[in-house]
Amino acid sequence: MRMRRKRYLDERLEACSAYIVSTEGEKLNALEAIRDTAYIDYEKLFGNGNKVVLEIGCGKGGFICECARRHPEINYIGVERTRNVIVTACEKAMQGNLPNVKFIPTCAAYLPRYIPPESISRI
């Protein structure tokens, strides 16, 4: 069954923009997107050089936000392709005031565009 669009989705995503990694300019073809890399600078994104853990398919963010709360010395990146779902994860991170978690609203096939090789400590 298809999930209904959340009310005020665009406004809610804008309110959580500090937790969302921009994917502007993402091409429709994943192979083209991978060739045209736009690697994330983790030190710039998080403001530190801590290890980075990736969760693919983070859903509503319960697991990743709890991990980020328990381990402030680790940076977390959650990936979820559905904006309708990722907004809930971003709101949880914002409510928990978790500076060590960010979200990428994209399909896992596009990750090689954003994630530098051998830069993730754990998936």
Residue map of PLM features:
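Conserved glycine-rich SAM-binding loop
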Residues: 59
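S-adenosyl-L-methionine
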Residues: 1-54, 62-69, 91-118
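Conserved SAM/SAH-binding beta-strand->alpha-helix loop
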Residues: 82
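Local beta-strand N-terminus motif with an aromatic residue
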Residues: 50, 119-121
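Conserved beta-strand/loop positions that form the S-adenosyl-L-methionine
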Residues: 56, 79
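Conserved short alpha-helix immediately C-terminal to the canonical SAM/SAH-binding motif I
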Residues: 85
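Short beta-strand element of Class I
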Residues: 74-77
